[in-house]
């Protein structure tokens, strides 16, 4: 069976396995985790900077105001979201309907025909750049911190507008990009990456950013799926003191992308040895100087696609999640305002890459929509030392800092001496993103970075949601519980479903599958060129609900606790990786007969990847030396690094004689997860396996 066929079979099995493993009677396995004290937010007046001190007030007047507005967003979404959209966004043509109503409940938006702000017209770039450049042209839009300390610079809204307009003309006239075309972007975290996205949206094209850590094979697949004729990249990247051959990776990918006509190359390092293939490749600066510094926006409909972002799916084939323009922008803007209590005088630092949704929403679009300053950081938290984040925060007087728990665990492990000497008093809000944050990391973050004075917003959301689903709200609004994402954002109606029956659990303490009962403006509209897959992945598993793929608990106060993925996706360092995609890469190796990939807990990255591998010729390892075994494992790890990227490489390879399977041939990955978690005594009844004797062999193999 081919890797793609194996992946498709996994999709069919996936939901059933979720239900199979929940056949036992309901119990409160995680209730003890939710028994934590409430941490109330404290006044932050003494942290206000001079440019905001005289007129600052929170956007919401406490928890009761949140509850009132939340109730309105659920009971009267038409009024709530129309007022917000008209108040905070500029429209070239006003919308005449807020959403397509549900057939059975006209006051509720429809999942099947999810569309918002119908017949309205606007432009993303105008809302992010033009309107601020007109009002406050000299205000700083972007602060750039290069990989090497001291090499950065700032850019005003006026300068940003001029550069965006020039790149928009490169796209339109030098590269023949038209409204509705997709443009692939493979760039490091530099201002030119933001300029690129804004220029693409300015002419009504659709950007498809590929994280610059993906391999050439992964990049190739995403370019081909999106049908991009144009790729924008850099010659090289700087990260952690190392040079990354960005353009070489693009060149390798383009060997199998016949439709690509042009590549625009920004010379980040100006290395003359980097391949430049004329006339296909165009030089950023040479082209930019050809064009004037103003070029008008292209009005687009509210539902016009803004971008595709490929995310890992349970079948292994990456999904091009498609976001629309108006709904996505409103979600980004409202969460900036209410989650982080952002004001236009603020400096917002998201330590996330634009290759992921966090960088899209909270480095590019959210801050610029709101008219504040966004900080773009090219480097890593450990270079040149573990003080880098804190140095940046003090240097630029950052007011909101947003980072993944993986980075916090790394910095906590490095020791508090790296924090000594830094004030960090400009901060008013700390954020966590990408994975659940453990209570002890939350407390360290609050104590050492926030001085126990400022809120931590532990945000839960996804590529598909576009913006926050469940989160505390800063500005003195939400009492916090360390480890909990807390309460749903406006318009988000969360429910806990019984995984077996699909029925809502309304107990005071509920555990099950987290689902959303109604669509919201920033919810993804489809999967690019595959709406059936969108329905099968998100809306069909539990009819009438959006299936998040996460398990969750809801405590007696209504707070949501995320318990992790219930599908075949592993969350490594806040990045969702498809186990099926990793399996497919390993199975393609000529030595391998079968493979099963699962996630397991890791102190640093949250989860790590483990691969259980059956070789075609078992004799090749049954009598092999330890050195030969290590060579086999290294070879398989390198296979994944090359096919997908370094971040997807398994931390553990276990060579085994066989895998645990049902009589129908389905691999029971649940058993592998239990063994890795040290829960071999909790496997349940394994007599239904076609090969029950393999369980002891697996346990012994992991011990080895």
From Swiss-Prot:
ATP binds at residues 434-436, 458-463, 550, 565, 576. A motif (Microbody targeting signal) lies at residues 702-704. Its EC number is 6.2.1.1. Gene3D superfamilies: 3.30.300.30, N-terminal domain of ligase-like. Pfam families: ACAS_N, AMP-binding, AMP-binding_C. It catalyses: acetate + ATP + CoA = acetyl-CoA + AMP + diphosphate. It is an enzyme of class 6 (ligase). Keywords: ATP-binding, Endoplasmic reticulum, Ligase, Microsome, Nucleotide-binding. Belongs to the ATP-dependent AMP-binding enzyme family. This is Acetyl-coenzyme A synthetase 1. The gene is ACS1.
